[in-house]
Amino acid sequence: MIHGSLSDLTALLSLEALTDERFVAEPRSGSRWRVYGGQFLGQGLIAATHGADLPVRAFHGYFIRAGNATQPLFYQVERLSEDHRQVRVHQEDKLLFTMEVVLGEYGSAPGIPMPDVPGPDACIPREKGIQNLQTDTESTWAVVDSPFDNRFVENIWHDVPAPPQHHVWFRTRQSAAKHDISAMEGQHMRQAVLAYYADDTIMDNALFPHGWAGSWERLQTTSLDHAMWFHADVPVDTWLLHAQDSPTAGGGRGMTRGLIYRQSGELVATAAQEILMRVSTGR
């Protein structure tokens, strides 16, 4: 995930239009390692909604190959219908990611009530949990320097097997109004910011039964796909609760899902993801 402010994140998600259907994302200064999955999701939404008036109702993205964060990414959009877009991402002539995006107005309806959990002020800041886990000050700085403020209901920073679920309060550290994404014309960027964030912690639920803190050394993990459905506008600079779980994890695969609520209890988005999990051989 990106270091820096909300301005840095919106700059990352913004694309240069080569044509009305082809876009490029240039690498950021200091980029290294592979492309974070949420970057594909957020940039894919920005590409798909270019020139669109309607918000995104749903998308489903498939991760095909890892991307090199030091090289440009090229986004090609095909307009399948008035409200249906397909996005394909290439790097050096290799297909990395595909996404189907559906546009449409929100439709409110009764849903699963928000879990009864403590509010964000009573929860564990992410940087505190990381500091309790290890002494790598550079990693801790990276968490503090994130565009997002995260507050965890459960203490996940241990290597004891735990139930495959947790709850996280989150919001951007800076106001959306100060970054020109609070008005109606900023709705696509708000959705892209949420899609970018939603890929961050949802995978962890499949790892908790293995002892989350020790899983990263024992397991190799990667996202296979990610889907989201938007039920209402997304106020990314106010507290949102991401209630997550993993209904099944076995045979090298893990299924995870998340419900995202306003603090008032309104369900604003639903997410689902499948991941690949392999035991590391240490070679």
Language-model region placement:
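Terminal targeting signals and extreme-terminal segments of soluble enzymes
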Residues: M1-R283
